[in-house]
Regions:
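Short, charged, low-complexity loops and linkers
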Residues: 1-2, 30
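A short, charged helix-loop
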Residues: 2-6, 17-20
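Hydrophobic structural segments
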Residues: 6-8, 160
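Short, amphipathic alpha-helical "lid/cap" segments that border enzyme active or binding sites
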Residues: 8, 12-15, 174
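A charged, amphipathic alpha-helical module
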Residues: 12, 16-145
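Alpha-helix capping/termination and helix-coil
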Residues: 124-127, 157-165
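Acidic, Ser/Thr-rich peripheral helices and adjacent loops at domain boundaries
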Residues: 145-159
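A short, acidic, amphipathic alpha-helical segment used as a generic capping/interface helix at domain edges
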Residues: 165-176
């Protein structure tokens, strides 16, 4: 189990082993760079949580567009994606939402299925929330910002919940 102190220590030890293996290939690990990266990723997480909230209020954003907003984060730096998402949030918050559609919540691992998104859009459905690993679920938990970056990452992993691929003996459910 990843949550108790021994689970956090085990996760950190795994990270340290990967670092040693990578350093054998060349380069060196930098605590300072990892700490800076945690700040970048936490800011990106916050922007993605905010855009998720804003998209719930804007039925004019199609399922396909929503999917693209989340998917695009895999293809650019987090800094660049954060800036684009923050600009989108600003524009959406400044405009009046379109007429309501039938709200739905989606769940799963992946929903980047153009045919499924087309059906959702054709049926006039509006995704108001998701529990999708490739969408908002990955942004729920930030790494603590402090001096020990590897412990922060291990604690982030320990604090992640409500994901079918992460063991949790209590099996909690998402609270809407």
């Amino acid at each position: 189990n990843r949550k108790p102190a021994y689970g956090v220590a085990y996760t950190k030890a795994g990270y340290e082993r990967v670092i040693r293996d990578l350093e054998k290939l060349g380069g060196t690990f930098s605590e300072e760079k990892l700490l800076a990266s945690i700040k970048v990723y936490n800011r990106h997480n916050a922007a993605m949580r905010k855009v998720d909230e804003v998209l719930a209020k804007h039925p004019e954003i199609t399922a396909a567009q929503r999917s693209d907003i989340f998917k695009s984060s895999f293809f650019m730096t987090k800094e660049e994606h954060t800036e684009l998402v923050e600009a989108l949030i600003e524009k959406l918050e400044a405009q009046t939402p379109a007429a309501e559609k039938l709200p739905i919540v989606i769940s799963g691992i992946l929903t980047d299925a153009p045919a499924l998104n087309a059906i959702l859009d054709e049926m006039g459905l509006h995704i108001v929330a998701d529990d999708v690993a490739a969408q908002s679920r990955q942004y729920r938990t930030d790494a603590p910002e402090r001096d020990d970056a590897l412990n922060a990452l291990a604690e982030k992993f320990a604090n992640m919940d409500n994901c079918s691929v992460l063991y949790n003996q209590d099996k909690p459910r998402v609270k809407w």
